[in-house]
Amino acid sequence: MSSSFFNPSFAFSSHFDPDGAPLSELSWPSSLAVVAVSFSGLFAVIVLMLACLCCKKGGIGFKEFENAEGDEYAADLAQGSPATAAQNGPDVYVLPLTEVSLPMAKQPGRSVQLLKSTDVGRHSLLYLKEIGRGWFGKVFLGEVNSGISSAQVVVKELQASASVQEQMQFLEEVQPYRALKHSNLLQCLAQCAEVTPYLLVMEFCPLGDLKGYLRSCRVAESMAPDPRTLQRMACEVACGVLHLHRNNFVHSDLALRNCLLTADLTVKIGDYGLAHCKYREDYFVTADQLWVPLRWIAPELVDEVHSNLLVVDQTKSGNVWSLGVTIWELFELGTQPYPQHSDQQVLAYTVREQQLKLPKPQLQLTLSDRWYEVMQFCWLQPEQRPTAEEVHLLLSYLCAKGATEAEEEFERRWRSLRPGGGGVGPGPGAAGPMLGGVVELAAASSFPLLEQFAGDGFHADGDDVLTVTETSRGLNFEYKWEAGRGAEAFPATLSPGRTARLQELCAPDGAPPGVVPVLSAHSPSLGSEYFIRLEEAAPAAGHDPDCAGCAPSPPATADQDDDSDGSTAASLAMEPLLGHGPPVDVPWGRGDHYPRRSLARDPLCPSRSPSPSAGPLSLAEGGAEDADWGVAAFCPAFFEDPLGTSPLGSSGAPPLPLTGEDELEEVGARRAAQRGHWRSNVSANNNSGSRCPESWDPVSAGGHAEGCPSPKQTPRASPEPGYPGEPLLGLQAASAQEPGCCPGLPHLCSAQGLAPAPCLVTPSWTETASSGGDHPQAEPKLATEAEGTTGPRLPLPSVPSPSQEGAPLPSEEASAPDAPDALPDSPTPATGGEVSAIKLASALNGSSSSPEVEAPSSEDEDTAEATSGIFTDTSSDGLQARRPDVVPAFRSLQKQVGTPDSLDSLDIPSSASDGGYEVFSPSATGPSGGQPRALDSGYDTENYESPEFVLKEAQEGCEPQAFAELASEGEGPGPETRLSTSLSGLNEKNPYRDSAYFSDLEAEAEATSGPEKKCGGDRAPGPELGLPSTGQPSEQVCLRPGVSGEAQGSGPGEVLPPLLQLEGSSPEPSTCPSGLVPEPPEPQGPAKVRPGPSPSCSQFFLLTPVPLRSEGNSSEFQGPPGLLSGPAPQKRMGGPGTPRAPLRLALPGLPAALEGRPEEEEEDSEDSDESDEELRCYSVQEPSEDSEEEAPAVPVVVAESQSARNLRSLLKMPSLLSETFCEDLERKKKAVSFFDDVTVYLFDQESPTRELGEPFPGAKESPPTFLRGSPGSPSAPNRPQQADGSPNGSTAEEGGGFAWDDDFPLMTAKAAFAMALDPAAPAPAAPTPTPAPFSRFTVSPAPTSRFSITHVSDSDAESKRGPEAGAGGESKEA
């Protein structure tokens, strides 16, 4: 029915037939429906009409009661209503009536609310009294009657005689106060300008100006506002300025005298024009009658011309300066700024010279330092100053959180709030050029890409911030962990028991309390610790970064540790990983890579060496020197005497090991002496020759000695972030510290009166040689000294000392003069021998000739391995780092080390292209097992698959050049050991290196190699390791079974033991990977090192062959009890089986468990280079299965400062640790734990290349000779220059730093440096370098990577083709 009701046809037709005739019968229901519908409609119509009428009548009634005054009140109230506020914005506020006991309290409020310009007219004003006079005329206190109430106001009256200009000025001054309505801005209630005199009616503030109020309170201390009130007032002033700026107004005279205070102590910016009269002393009146608020005005607004003071218009940044002074004035209760200085002094010192700054207010405030920090922000340069909004945000936060938030939490949030991204200062914040610390911010060029990650609630801790800075040298990744502290070295990672044991092992007695461990390479840090993972675009050579099993066992490293030289080099290389510190004298090594404070703060090295005696010494020493090192302070002692060889000891007998503080002291002394003597990295530096004495010309240094970076490079032991080559080597730190100091190695050099050579290993050889004894003792001594100095430092491999051999190292002879150039700081009495040794060491470094690199498998696996890798790199990669050409072989060694990645970075094909030297590569005979991968730094930053980590095929035999340099005609009577230096390209497995630290190390190595290679020409008396430079970069020089390990010198000491061993050999006991030639038996006789052309500076990386105990060398490395002495020289199994006196750093006696794996493992690791190398790098040293007679060697980290030792121990876990612990570490292998401010610089392998900029322009001009194929590098001409291999050209491209591996062809693991001590031994051809894939950086805070930053540089692309391109070309100059 309902439907029918609404059907018109039915409704109207239902009662009619189709014709319209009415139906006789009507349905009753239908009728009712029709009626109901009708009534409903009628009712609806009536309701609508009534509604309309009611509405109309209501409106009419409202109008009837409307009147003008009421309308205004309504309008006024409407403006304050929420709806209106929403429409008009926040500029208009209805101020609540303040409930104050004072009778006048409500008056101002009501006047603000109710008085309108229409209400206020001349007729409604009642003058009460005159309160002052201004430039315009009189100021009166008046009262306005608005009908229902009255309110007090201030009336400014313009004098009737005012000119039109004055009239305009009078009205303009009040414009902001009329247009803006804000609780912290004085309001102008009305202006009466219809007739003269002009009147301005201002809001009345009963307490007057803020300055007068505070001064009165200061007199009556009981009335002084409490600090919280003052802080609130400061926020209100900032809020008022912010509102002005948002509306494009600036205050021309911001100061407390121009801020007024209401009855409820609310601050309002504004004035009545009485300041000039009341505070005459606050103004400097010029001859032109300009009133200048000199003590508040920003310096850029004032200028002086012909004794006339000129003032420009105020700016927003100028207001911020004045705001800072106003806040200072507030906290000083109205004290005039610079109260002790006259206006002229303020003008001279504050305005003109900008030297005088206001001191911190004496008022005791919560977070007073932060308040003062904000003030200082306001006084930065105009472009660096925070905005008013930033200042207000900071002050508001300080007020709100200062009293309630825990200090630690506050600090974290504070950094995130600071203008400019918060934090250059906090590694994380790094952003604000203005606020990161006046200096930090000013100099900051960081881009806080990850600022959002520091936002509230992103991290529970919020302590970590990663700042990525794009620099000419590459990307700087600054990551700071604030939550952790040195006290909790392994909080999340280790169980209490393990932690205690670890510290006991790693931080022997006397070790600094703090430990900064590089726990494991694999697992992300547990808990709140973070690790940085460098991911490779494509896996390189199937390298599995996480494959711990692939990495050579730490024990192998131990054996390598025996090789002092290698170890030393490795430790230098590791040093950057452990904490590159710019060299002490670093101009170039800026602490950027590793903040010194970080080291200083971090007694990181508690886990210094497995050996309690040696470990504490090396690490403990590092603590003191860490400051010098910055983070690089691995083992300052190591750097001082990384090889354990001390310039101090010249006698055949090794110096007694120093223990504890004694060792530290001696290390310090040696270091000082060494610094004086060594400019370039001594054996300690991974860049065996890369360090040049400061005296060297930066360019010449870069070009002359691979191991000797240019002076400016030298200072910066670690390359700039953009300087991958330099920083990679621990050397950089050493160099930076002292022009004449090779960290760790200087001892070696100084020994025997040999001038401390810049070469890394040279000191051991030099010392050995200088000891002049055929006593292996001399070598052991070097090792021992290094140990003593560095504690866990690996002794330099016992290299037949020139004196032992009775013949100077040939290669060094020529560079004796060069040596002075290279080592101006260090006398080179036995320059020939020393230089030769250095060169040899450099070559060995570059060519992984020194097993010591591997040696660092003992002690901390991470530290040892990293150190080992570093040393390996130092000996091999160190040279590599210094000489990309040497890198391949060293890479093998590097892989052994936890740091090897950095060494891998050092792997810079410098070995391949180094000065024409072919790298001695055990892989020449066979692939170095763990080299490719073992080099992983253990930092997750490194991705082995990353192109950076891709070993480039050795297309250039840089190392041979280095070796040739080393071998280059030494005048020494001792037979030259000829090392076939052609280095085979690193296996693709080897191409990996840690981009983060290793790239730094590598850069350092590269930079070092460049300069040092130049030095290679010098020959040192005594046997030289001649590294025939094979033209073929792919060639690898292998140590002859009989030859390698010993210099074939007359004395066993001459043996260049594992020194030649490839990095490939993992931290395994044997330095040389199986691919390497078997360890040479005791020297069969003086081996002639083929002299190679050497630049003016000689590479001073001397690897001291450590006579195998089995061989019964007269002496073993003597060192601290912890040092691995006799056993340290371990046979390298890599060769045919002839035991080779391993070059090793004497470390504190480590248990056999520390021994590195046998070379076999190295080979195995070569097979799984990536994994093995990584394992070697990260795994705690385990007794190597293959280490038969090899005593576990603890890698010696060569550091300029003793604090470096700490880093070393952290990087390498002592093999003493239980297998369980080692396993745990391996499980966490990829975790890098920092418990202090840590700056991590991640560089793409290629990114540090010249494209990123030339850290050392001079170096660029003169690329390392090895790169150039300088005469110092015999093989330079023969083998492709590394630079050529690298798209960027020579390693020197990086401003004297070596190009990254990507720049150089990556060497295959097989290309691990093998040294053929036998001159006749041909060097195997190095595999053609494989293009390095682009690498990308993934920063992983926590197991899951929060963000991934991919940085692909042109050099990366170049590097891909670089290995191939570089195969035959000479190194290019950056």
From Swiss-Prot:
Pfam families: PK_Tyr_Ser-Thr
Induction: Up-regulated during apoptosis.
Biased amino acid composition, Gly residues: 1365-1374
Biased composition regions of type Pro residues, renumbered to the chain: 1321-1332
Cysteine pairs bridged by disulfides in the record: none
Keyword Methyltransferase: no
Localization: Membrane; Cytoplasm; Cytoplasm, Perinuclear region
Molecular function in Gene Ontology: ATP binding; protein serine kinase activity; protein serine/threonine kinase activity; protein tyrosine kinase activity
Signal peptide, first to last residue: none
Domain Protein kinase: 125-395
Result when mutating S81F: In an ovarian mucinous carcinoma sample; somatic mutation
Residues annotated as transmembrane: 32-52
Major place of residence: membrane
Catalyzed reactions: L-seryl-[protein] + ATP = O-phospho-L-seryl-[protein] + ADP + H(+); L-threonyl-[protein] + ATP = O-phospho-L-threonyl-[protein] + ADP + H(+)
Tissues in which the UniProt entry reports expression: Expressed in brain.
InterPro entries listed in its UniProt record: Kinase-like_dom_sf, LMTK1_c, Prot_kinase_dom, Protein_kinase_ATP_BS, Ser-Thr/Tyr_kinase_cat_dom, Tyr_kinase_AS
Keywords recorded for this protein, A-Z: ATP-binding, Cytoplasm, Kinase, Membrane, Nucleotide-binding, Phosphoprotein, Serine/threonine-protein kinase, Transferase, Transmembrane, Transmembrane helix
Binding site for ATP: I131, G132, R133, G134, W135, F136, G137, K138, V139, K156
Highest taxon of the lineage: Eukaryota
Active-site residue numbers: D253 (proton acceptor)
Family recorded in the similarity comment: Belongs to the protein kinase superfamily. Tyr protein kinase family.
PANTHER family on file: SERINE/THREONINE-PROTEIN KINASE LMTK1, SERINE_THREONINE-PROTEIN KINASE LMTK1
Oligomer and partners: Interacts with CDK5.
Record function comment: May be involved in neuronal differentiation.
Name of the molecule in the record: Serine/threonine-protein kinase LMTK1
